[in-house]
Amino acid sequence: MHSTVRPPVALPPNFSSTEFRDALGMFATGVTIVTARNAEGVFIGLTANSFNSVSLTPPLVLWSLARSAGSMAAFSAGSHYAINILSADQQDLARQFAARGNDRFSGVQFVEGSGGAPLLQGAAATFECFNRSRYEEGDHVIFVGEVERCAHRTGASPLLFHGGKFYTEHAL
C-alpha cells in the first residue's frame, strides 16, 4: 500500500482578506474596551472584540492587537491592563475608543484599578489583568492576561457585534 504524506504546512488560502473578514463577521461577539496606563502615566484604550477566556485555574483571558497599532508598545511594555466588557447602552463608547485621532477618554467616567488601568463606569464586567504573556501570530499579537480582580453587574445586558453592526441580547 502506498500513501502520500503531506508536508506539515498550511495550504495557501483560496479566499481574499475581505472574504475572510466577512466570514469572521458571522461570529457574534461581545465588545470590549481594553485600557491601560502607559509608562508616562497617560491612559490608553481601544475597542476590541477579540476577547476570550483561556483558563479557570489560574484565571486567564486573552485578546489580540494588530502589530501595527499605535498602542502596541505601551500594551507590550506595561505590567497591567483592564478588559471592560461593554453594556448594551455603551455603543457610543465603543465607537469613541475605535476612532483615531481623538482623546478617547474625553468625557469618560472611570476609576483606576489596582494596576492603574481604567475601569469604565457602566461596563457589564471588568477584568483587571497582569500582562502574563504575548504571542506573535500573523499580523497580530495575542495577549494573555492573568486576572487579578474581576467584577460584573448582575442583570446587565452586554453589547454584541455581528456582521459589522451592534446588537443587544434577546432570549430565544
Question: Language-model features: where?
Answer:
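Basic, polyanion-binding surface patches
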Residues: 1-172
